[in-house]
Amino acid sequence: MRAIGIILAGGNSKRMRELSNKRAISAMPVAGSFRSIDFALSNMSNSHIQNVAVFTQYNSRSLNEHLSSSKWWDFGRKQGGLFVFTPTITASNSDWYRGTADALYQNLNFLKNSHEPYVVIAGGDCIYKLDYNKVLEYHVEKKADITVVCKRIGEDEDMTRFGQVHINDDGRIVDFEEKPMTASSDTISCGIYVIRRRQLIELIERCAAEDRVDFVKDILVRYKNLKRIYAYKLESYWSNIASVDSYYKTNMDFLKPEVRNFFFKEYPDIYSKVDDLPPAKYNPGAVVRNSLISSGSIVNGTVENSILFKKAYVGNNCVIKNSIILNDVYIGDNTVIENCIVESRDTIRANTTYIGTPEDIKVVIEKNERYTL
């Protein structure tokens, strides 16, 4: 593909509550065996983008560990590859990334030293499948300065947490509002952009000269009437992880056959770092209904409408319903967990009950951390 890829993976959200204490949002576990960033990385690999940079910042240890080998996404190559950039103290800079535009500016050498004519920018906190080649073809066809991947979402979604766009009959974005107080459109930005590399360098340098730091507010919103900004409409599944509720809903979506088949049975594949673990084990007395049970897990009790991540242990006479159990969790006998997210490496003592509601998902974080199964 005639583009380099940039994944913005340094952000945090207070709405994630305690779940982001251990990891960046881009490293949040998804669908039993994946991380949020795997979807953007897989899309870039499947689109034949050979030169990809990941910008990390907040709580990046877990994310850096996940990205320690690029071979899982087929970026282990002599030319190009996967690069991870963190904020660096230099003679001219001693700040963290102050915004998305500032992150691009602090890594401007990556853009200047590349030779591909286009750049694909994506977030590491979104779950979707997309061939970026189709977006680039649309971008060239429309002679656009910037192309924004957009999607119509349902009335049940909280529109105010997204950037909302207004599109004319030709597909051009005529108005862009970043997280307005009230919904004025049913079409949102998916946080995926295609732009010519030289133009991006010019815009980023202009932002830096004027001490502007945000890509959306200081480029998309500011230049919406001065640049040809077009919308590419995404028709397939897309989800953004930005809160406990959205994280829970995204994982629960993978219990739906149509979502699961779209990601894991339809070409192309989604890739992730692989752990050499035995298959899940179901002991006598185990009952499992409509659940994803990941490798290395052991189930002795009842699990319904839930997701167990790697190396989870469910004791005798336990009942787990409508819950997400993260990696390396030990759940003692006679425990009831409903409508909860249990943090990784927690030890849940026997004869314990944790019950949330569909409207208020309970995040369970115990002080008794386990480090081996």
PLM regions: where:
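Unchanged
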Residues: 1-254, 364-366
